[in-house]
Every structure is written in C-alpha cells, then in structure tokens.
Amino acid sequence: MTAQGIYLDNNATTRVDPDVLAEMLPLFTEQFGNPSSMHGFGAAVGGQDRMGAQAGAGAARAAHDSEIVFTSGGTESDNTAILSTLEAYPKKKSIVTSVVEHPAVLALCDYLEKKRGYTVHRIGVDNRGNLDLDAYKRCALGPDVAIVSIMWANNETGTIFPIEELAQLAKAAGAVFHTAVQAVGKIPMNVRHSAVDMLCACGHKLHAPKGVHALYVKRGLRFRPIVRGGHQERSRRAGNGERAGHRRAGGGAHVALMHMTDENTRVKRSRQAGAAILAAVPNCFVTGNPANRLPNTCNVAFEYIEGEAILLLLNEADIAASSGSACTSGSLEPSHVMRAMGVPYTAAHGPTRLSLSRETTEEEIDRVIRVVPGMRTGRSVSPYWSQAAPEGVRPVYS
C-alpha cells in the first residue's frame, strides 16, 4: 500500500523499484554525456547502454545483446516491428493479427488496410479469450503474409496464447512473427530457442521508468529502420533516447526475472483467492481463461453496472483498478476485448481489471474483497437492465 492507497493497476504501469531509481539518479547528474561522443563522458554512458541491453537480453533469454533495440515506448516498438517488416518484404501484402490486440497494433493495421491497400486477417477468440487456432491455420497463413503480430498474453484478461505454436506455423509459411509486451517478466520465455522473430518489452510494466521500451530483433532478420537519422541503436533507431532509463529498463527486466517464480506463486495465490470471492457476488463472473492466464491478472465482469461507477466506488476506498485497457479507458463503448469474447451487453460495460504486482499484499486483497459488495447499490440505477444488446454482442455468455 502506498500513501495514495492500494494500487491494483499494474498492467497499466508499475511503481519504479527504489533500487532501480537509486541506480538511475547518478546518470542524470554525473554520467550525463552523449553516448555518441568520443570523450570519456560519452563512453561512460555508452557503457550503461550496453549493460541495459545485456540485462534486457538476459530477461528474454536472447542470444545476443545486439538483438535489443531501445525505443520510446510500446506503441513505437509495435509500429516499428510491423512497418519495418513491410518495408523489408515489399511484395507481401498481408498481415495477420487478432481481434483482441492492443490499439497500438489494431489502429496501425486499420490504417494499413484502408490507406495502403494491405489485407489484414483478424483472428477471433472464444468466450474465454482463447485464439481460434483453426481459423489461424486455415485462412491466415499464406505466401503473401509478411508479418504475424499477436500478443503473448492479453492485457485485459490475462489469457495466454500458444505463442510457440503460432510462431512455428508463421515461420513455416515464411512470415515474420512479432509478439509480447504484457507477458514479459510475468511468465518464462526463451526467444533464443524460439521461432519468435521480434518481441516487445515495456520497462514501465516491470518497475522500471516510463518512456523506455525494448524491441528484440532476432539476429539475421531483415530490418529497416523507421526512425531515421543518426547511427544510434546500431543504426536501427535514430535519436538519443533516455539513457538512464535504458540502463534500468534492462535492470527492471532482470529483477523481474529473478523474482518471477516466488512472485508468481504468491501473486497467483492472492489472485485466485480474490477471484473466488468476487465470483461469489451475484451477477458477476471472471473473464478470460481461468486455467491459462497471467498470474497477476483478474478481470471481473459485473452485470448491470458501468465500469466507471465501479472504479469510482473503488477510488472512494483508495483502491486503484481499471476498466479495460488504460489506452482506451476514456471511451464509453464496451471494450473491444469483451465484445470479441461475446460478453453480454449487461456486463460488457462493467469489467474491472485487478492487476497485481510483487508489491501487492494479501491484506490489500482482503480490503478489496470487503469493498466489492457495494456494487449492488450501483446496479439499482443502471440503465443496462432494459437496454437492448448492440450488433456484435451475444445476449448470453456461455
């Protein structure tokens, strides 16, 4: 618990680890040189960059630190992975993704389809958020596919996709495979012995600073820089990035890796305990695959109440959670993930995501559970008792 209360929105961002912050501070006041400079100040910072890349490579079990490209954030990394591949394979005009991707991928695919003439195959999911593998195998992979961009685990429900199987199928079809973001540091991964070609890791979701992201690019992969200019990042991404963050983004990933087993066991136990009691509240259910999702994520859909009302109730109790993705929380429409899963209209507006971290305590979870019964009051004034379901949302969840 912090001075502001209980923070259960760790899939949106995390608190910077105090040790990470302590190691960053000298890089603002002492080792502040431009790493492109030839003098000692620049060389010292360049060394910090290499250490960050080595730590990031280790967290993903990459073979070489040269496979790590630092960017400004997840959106840039996702855009870079897709646009670089399309430029490297100009004759291929198809893209494969899923209907539950982050807006950073979906919005770009929409643009490429409408403005650039690409064909985009969007693979659906079932009511637990599991990818439709038959559709993926049947219609999505052909010689015209340049890239497959599918998240390792969903940021709203935590449902984990069979990434290695998907990547192997893409590789057999001659397509580049791009994945990750939310799953990094939460579940084991080893890209060295994987068919994954590109992988995104977000520092601020690993108790490292915001504005720092890493894109893994497998050695030997065709890569075309999207941000052009200087020779930084081995000429793959121009511009002087946030150097202190580069060092500690890798450090945050390394710390997450060290704590992964113990943390996941404890966090998963808290999540399961919370989910069991939350599910006992009338007219609510846990979304996503109960047996195969991120250990820190619990998304509960409450029927007959808006997500905003739930978040306000929690906020009054000094509990921070979210309704859907942080990047779309300003929208009044149901989450595209809930719609894709067929969550009924009476509940599609009321999903509440509780995302835990290694700092979350069992006492905090108990406090959340005590607050949840207050949802019943909000239901009594909700308009969703009588509204009809819009097109694309099934009336029942089965």
From Swiss-Prot:
Keywords, ordered alphabetically? Iron, Iron-sulfur, Metal-binding, Nitrogen fixation, Pyridoxal phosphate, Transferase
**Protein name (database record):** Cysteine desulfurase
Q: Where is this region: Disordered?
A: 230-253
Q: Which organism is it from?
A: Azospirillum brasilense
Per the entry, what this protein does is:
Catalyzes the removal of elemental sulfur atoms from cysteine to produce alanine. Seems to participate in the biosynthesis of the nitrogenase metalloclusters by providing the inorganic sulfur required for the Fe-S core formation.
- MF GO annotations: cysteine desulfurase activity; iron-sulfur cluster binding; metal ion binding
Query: What EC number(s) does its UniProt record assign?
Result: 2.8.1.7
Q: Which cofactor does it need?
A: pyridoxal 5'-phosphate
